[in-house]
């Protein structure tokens, strides 16, 4: 969907520029009206694109999304060609007639697709949209989420001290832990929950996982049955209000510690926070979120929020070997030195992300040959077909799937850069604008909008700040390798991006009709002629 949304945003911006220019003087009023009609039709398509059925699935199917995208790209090419001709026009009636014919042809294509979409929406309303198939949460299973914590020793000590001794206030307080998916927030929170000091101070301790698709009734039942221990057979028949009252009664007068894991929105916190009474006895919450703004919103003191860091090389190594060989691990055999060397490469490739280290270690734990380890070490991305790696990607994909369409397109644009590439923020923002990703109608301050999008992506832990200026402004940024893999998978599946590397096997002649962005990351290319239909050609040679 992101590629289609980006194409529609871009063509709308191009039409808007033409309508506000002085280039239409030679055209008749009917052709100006055609442009305005095109503008309205593409606007309608963009609104329809983000529409959902009652079951939560998109109204516009993937096949139709591709068709809309191709029409939008075709229309933008023709409108830009029209602008070029109008600029060069010198009262040439033949050229003017050619411009009119182009507009007519584009309008016919758009009308066909728009009519089809409108018919589809009507049918969906009649049928009330089939409910989406139920699916299990893509968080990793118990084997990968095993409660093993390497590193963060100082952070744990400070957190326990903060929760048990507090700030001096007797009021109920919230401390937040924020960071990118897979960085270890949930495991960190588990170690805090089971810490002996926490057990001594808080009589009632509990855990609820909110997630992005939370069910208030289920959360209340978990609190009643597993935390407060006062659930009974009548709970299932109670409405949410009655269940909330029972939770409040059960916690009244108690000193409790509750972990609220994986919360996605301020609204979610507002909906559950009133369940917990403030009895003036220093009750505490530990809240985890991948969205920094959500964490700071809920925190009693936002400045005390813990931003999870990547593991150091030593911490990564300990976690890796623990996962590969077990708790009392040791490496034996004649190839011990070689295995350690290869293991070091694997650890380095995981860039300090615990979820990635755990997933890769889970794969290597079943491999006993040195050459198998060496194959994995060459590139972590070579594991893309492995089930554990796919599970790992599904976890981080949750953040991407919940982005607005505009932010999705901007996030996917990171894929044009090589892995671990540090990107100038100024350059990135200008590229987004040049690509038409920020061409919002009625918005003139494109750079401000782009900066806000980047800030939101950073706040949602999808983008890492690499360097700041002396006044605190972000100078450079990058994305984690795991997110880069996600970018590539999503962008290529939507025919938005193709990266031409030295090992690329696709025929050059196949590229010009299929991809919007071509990123050349190899010295071995011979011609640009075949890329003429691609909107953008990036030559990024990091050799």
Model-flagged regions — what are they?
Residues 12, 18-21, 36-58, 223-237, ...:
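Non-catalytic, charged helical/coil tracts that couple and regulate nucleotide-powered enzyme cores
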Residues 1-26:
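Membrane-inserting effector segments that mediate pore formation, membrane fusion
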Residues 78, 85, 89-131:
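Alpha-helical bundle protein-protein interaction modules that mediate dimerization/oligomerization
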Residues 258-260:
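Hydrophobic residues in beta-strands of the RecA-like P-loop NTPase core, especially within AAA+ ATPase
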Residues 19-89, 103, 110:
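Extended, amphipathic alpha-helical segments that serve as helical scaffolds
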């Amino acid at each position: 969907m992101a590629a289609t949304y980006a194409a529609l945003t871009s063509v709308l911006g191009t039409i808007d520029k033409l309508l506000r220019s002085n280039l239409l003087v030679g055209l008749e009023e009917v052709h100006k009206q055609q442009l305005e009609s095109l503008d309205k039709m593409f606007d309608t398509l963009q609104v329809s694109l983000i529409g959902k059925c009652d079951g939560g699935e998109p109204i516009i199917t993937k096949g139709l999304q591709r068709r809309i995208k191709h029409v939008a790209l075709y229309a933008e090419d023709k409108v830009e060609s029209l602008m070029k001709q109008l600029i060069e026009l010198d009262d040439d009636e033949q050229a003017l007639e050619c411009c009119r014919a182009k507009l007519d042809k584009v309008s016919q294509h758009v009308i066909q697709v728009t009519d089809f979409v409108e018919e589809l929406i009507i049918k969906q309303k009649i049928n009330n949209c089939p409910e989406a198939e139920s699916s299990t949460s893509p968080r990793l299973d118990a084997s990968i989420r095993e409660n093993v914590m390497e590193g963060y020793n100082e952070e744990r000590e400070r957190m326990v001290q903060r929760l048990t001794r507090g700030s001096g206030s007797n009021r109920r307080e919230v401390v937040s832990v924020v960071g990118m998916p897979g960085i270890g927030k949930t495991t960190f929170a588990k170690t805090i929950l089971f810490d002996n000091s926490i057990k001594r101070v808080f009589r009632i301790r509990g855990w609820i996982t909110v997630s992005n698709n939370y069910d208030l009734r289920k959360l209340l039942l978990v609190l009643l049955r597993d935390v407060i221990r006062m659930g009974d057979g009548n709970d299932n028949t109670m409405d949410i209000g009655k269940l909330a009252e029972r939770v409040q009664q059960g916690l009244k007068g108690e000193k409790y510690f509750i972990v609220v894991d994986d919360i996605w929105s301020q609204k979610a916190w507002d909906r559950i926070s009133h369940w917990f009474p403030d009895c003036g006895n220093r009750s505490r919450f530990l809240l985890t979120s991948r969205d920094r703004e959500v964490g700071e919103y809920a925190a009693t003191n936002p400045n005390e929020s813990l931003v999870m860091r990547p593991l150091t090389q030593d911490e990564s190594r300990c976690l890796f070997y623990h996962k590969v060989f077990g708790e009392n691990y040791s490496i034996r055999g004649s190839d011990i030195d070689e295995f350690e060397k290869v293991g070091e490469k694997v650890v380095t490739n995981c860039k300090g992300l615990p979820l990635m280290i755990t997933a890769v270690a889970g794969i290597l734990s079943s491999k006993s040959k040195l050459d198998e380890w060496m194959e994995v070490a060459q590139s972590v991305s070579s594991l893309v077909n492995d089930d554990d790696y796919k599970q790992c990607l599904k976890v981080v994909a949750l953040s991407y799937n919940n982005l607005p369409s505009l932010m999705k397109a901007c996030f996917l644009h990171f894929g044009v850069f090589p892995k671990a590439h540090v990107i100038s923020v100024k350059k990135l923002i200008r590229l987004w604008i040049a690509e038409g990703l920020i061409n919002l109608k009625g918005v003139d301050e494109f750079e401000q909008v782009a900066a806000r999008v980047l800030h939101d992506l950073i706040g949602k832990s999808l983008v890492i700040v690499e360097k700041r200026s002396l006044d605190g402004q972000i100078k450079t940024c990058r994305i984690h390798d795991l997110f880069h893999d996600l970018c590539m998978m999503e962008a290529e599946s939507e025919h938005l991006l193709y990266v031409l590397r030295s090992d690329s096997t696709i025929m050059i002649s196949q590229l010009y009709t299929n991809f919007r962005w071509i990123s050349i990351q190899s010295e071995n290319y011979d011609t640009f002629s075949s890329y003429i239909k691609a909107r953008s050609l990036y030559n990024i040679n990091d050799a």
